[in-house]
Amino acid sequence: EKIKICLQKQVNSSFSLHNGFGGNLYATEEKRMFELVKPKAGASVLNQSTWIGFGDSRTDKSNPNFPRSADVSVKTANKFRSLTGGSLMLSMFGPPGKVDYLYQGCGKHKVFYEGVNWSPHAAIDCYRKNWTDIKLNFQKNIYELASQSHCMSLVNALDKTIPLQATAGVAGNCNNSFLKNPALYTQEVTPPXXKCGKENLAFFTLPTQFGTYECRLHLVASCYFIYDSKEVYNKRGCDNYFQVIYDSSGKVVGGLDNRVSPYTGNSGDTPTMQCDMIQLKPGRYSVRSSPRFLLMPERSYCFDMKEKGPVTAVQSIWGKDRKSDYAVDQACLSTPGCMLIQKQKPYTGEADDHHGDQEMRELLSGLDYEARCISQSGWVNETSPFTEEYLLPPKFGRCPLAAKEESIPKIPDGLLIPTSGTDTTVTKPKSRIFGIDDLIIGLLFVAIVEAGIGGYLLGSRKESGGGVTKESAEKGFEKIGNDIQILRSSTNIAIEKLNDRISHDEQAIRDLTLEIENARSEALLGELGIIRALLVGNISIGLQESLWELASEITNRAGDLAVEISPGCWIIDNNICDQSCQNFIFKFNETAPVPTIPPLDTKIDLQSDPFYWGSSLGLAITAAISLAALVISGIAICRTK
């Protein structure tokens, strides 16, 4: 008896329809193209080989209580330049009896976890009871210059020329000694013959190189005394106080001149010392001061200014019973590009009250890893381009954009059945997708990879099949390209309108960045909608072609036992070919059909400039589908007599 056997696609109510460019699909499941990621609190780095840390006892491997005394792992401690009791500011000024460590090193990303050793608890005087405002200014300049340099180093001995009449001085309020920088020089005079002494003229040189470290810019402390009145300084009738630094052209670059500037007018009778942080290029500088006292710059921090990079500052405070300041926090928050890591609880140590805090260890544990994105909100190492909340700037790397979960396109999954659908040139498929029309919104900086997403996704039709036609794909991508040009033009117009706002309002800069981020997110979601439609269409056509390949395989296996009367249908004599014979031909000895297909490999690589301010967005899109070994599922064998 002759019977008719056909391959028949079966779809029931459990399937959902997915429309695409070039073909449609029925699927039993669906999944979002990406999930939302949540940043991890604390610090991390983009590249383990290109960062360096500067620290103190909490990152010092040589501390006798290490690792219990540390807030970082052994791996991370190896990246730090640290010494117990040290700080960058202590090494800059060198107060008597304090640790003096030569801080220097190179790295694109710099992490600073130091500062606590110069705080109110240290009780450093030297003509100044409270150094917090100077510390704030010092740390701010360090973070600013570090963000523009690959290498930095303390220069602990500047070449100088001191006037013969001046000798090194000491102060009772400085442990009967004085700072190493500035150094105090005094003139001993014998009234009345020489009651005032001579004006001081000294010179110092900022080098272009210190050891192996290139110096294109120096951070120098310009220190001078502040007198409340002329009478306080002028007890000997020696005119007004002044201490001024000049560059080689005679321009004033630092200091105080009470010959032209008023005294404070307060009622005190003891001077205080002020130190301004000034940024100077290498060269020879002169210092002129009124008789009796000279404060001489003898140290600097030098920076090569060769590479911009992230800066992370970690809150550096004492545990209980010791007074801290928050200069590090304030300095970082007021410095563009500086990410601040802050505790939420009081510092509670393991080794003692001040070393080995568990919360800080957790916040710094990310330094052991590489992240795709680092930001003030935390760090992300997942590949998804979307996060639920807007990541606060500064941020560096490939940072996800804020999006709502329901706005992320879904792709078919599970059991897939192809059906005919629309062509790539059709702008309104039967079921509208989130696609090209949604793209023309807001601001967008976008660049498609050189080959175009079609280079990864579609390609030209070959003899063996696979993909939609080359002509159809080209028309579709030509439309995408034209729409992107419209977006670019709209972006330029919008930016020009915002220029005036930015020049007059700093808040506008922050508003603009948020506006651009939102527009980028909308545009990226639109691009994903296009990719989803292309994926669906490409899979649909690939599955249909695989059906014909399956039919050809059946015909070949049947040989003369079955005659193909139409695509996917055969006539067979069951008297000649029994059930086991039919199973061999149509079921491949129970090995087909299989219940699943190879998974889709859909990757979005979001690339941005490494610096957040003024960055542009590049969108590199790759989407690949493996159809080479695809075996169709969801196929029933229909038998009729």
Swiss-Prot record:
In this UniProt entry, which cysteines form S-S bonds? C6-C569, C106-C151, C126-C174, C196-C238, C215-C302, C223-C275, C332-C338
Give the UniProt subcellular location, in the record's own words: Virion membrane; Host cell membrane
What ranges does the record give for the region Fusion domain-2, renumbered to this chain? Answer: 352-637
The cross-references to InterPro entries, in alphabetical order and at most eight, read:
Capsid_hemagglutn, Hemagglutn-estrase_core, Hemagglutn-estrase_hemagglutn, Hemagglutn_stalk_influenz-C
Primary role: Binds to the N-acetyl-9-O-acetylneuraminic acid residues on the cell surface, bringing about the attachment of the virus particle to the cell. Plays a major role in the determination of host range restriction and virulence. Class I viral fusion protein. Responsible for penetration of the virus into the cell cytoplasm by mediating the fusion of the membrane of the endocytosed virus particle with the endosomal membrane. Low pH in endosomes induce an irreversible conformational change in HEF2, releasing the fusion hydrophobic peptide. Several trimers are required to form a competent fusion pore.
Which Gene Ontology BP terms does the record give?
A: fusion of virus membrane with host endosome membrane; fusion of virus membrane with host plasma membrane; symbiont entry into host cell; virion attachment to host cell
Location of region: Fusion domain-1: 1-26
Spell out the subunit comment.
Answer: Homotrimer of disulfide-linked HEF1-HEF2.
Which residues lie within the region annotated Esterase domain-2? 297-351
Q: What lineage is this protein's organism placed in? A: Viruses, Riboviria, Orthornavirae, Negarnaviricota, Polyploviricotina
Q: Which reaction does it catalyse?
A: N-acetyl-9-O-acetylneuraminate + H2O = N-acetylneuraminate + acetate + H(+); N-acetyl-4-O-acetylneuraminate + H2O = N-acetylneuraminate + acetate + H(+)
Its gene is: HE
Recorded protein name is Hemagglutinin-esterase-fusion glycoprotein
Q: What EC designation does it have? A: 3.1.1.53
